[in-house]
Amino acid sequence: SNEVFFLRDNQLMFPNAVKDKLVKTSDGWALDIYVFSPRPLDDLLIEPNMPKLTLVVKARECQLAINDKAYAAVSQNRHEATYKELPLLQGWNKVSIKIGQIDKNEFTGNFRCDNRNEFLSSLKVMYINPEAK
């Protein structure tokens, strides 16, 4: 289905249909996705070899929150924002993306794992919280 996040060239790509999931806000567009990680990624001190997950969002304006905590981009240029070492917890994580008014048409994104590509295939991504009652 064209709604599924898919692996290509060592990236977990946002599908084209993701644009249809954007919700209008007062100052732009918002998307919540739910990312399942088989292991916690939030404590690099314990395990130096832990997968380092990156999210790249194609948008001129972007804000990210992970499990409702704001998370800063390491870089933001005219075309995209890059978020590194996402502190996902083990299990399902809410990833909230906000983009600007003019960003909807170009909007896309991908997850990368610079140090352990094989980790990407163990992630799951959904649009609806699978744990919501």
Report the location of each language-model feature.
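Beta-strand-rich recognition domains
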Residues: 1-64, 69, 84-133
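Short, solvent-exposed beta-strand-to-loop segments that form ligand-recognition rims
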Residues: 71-79
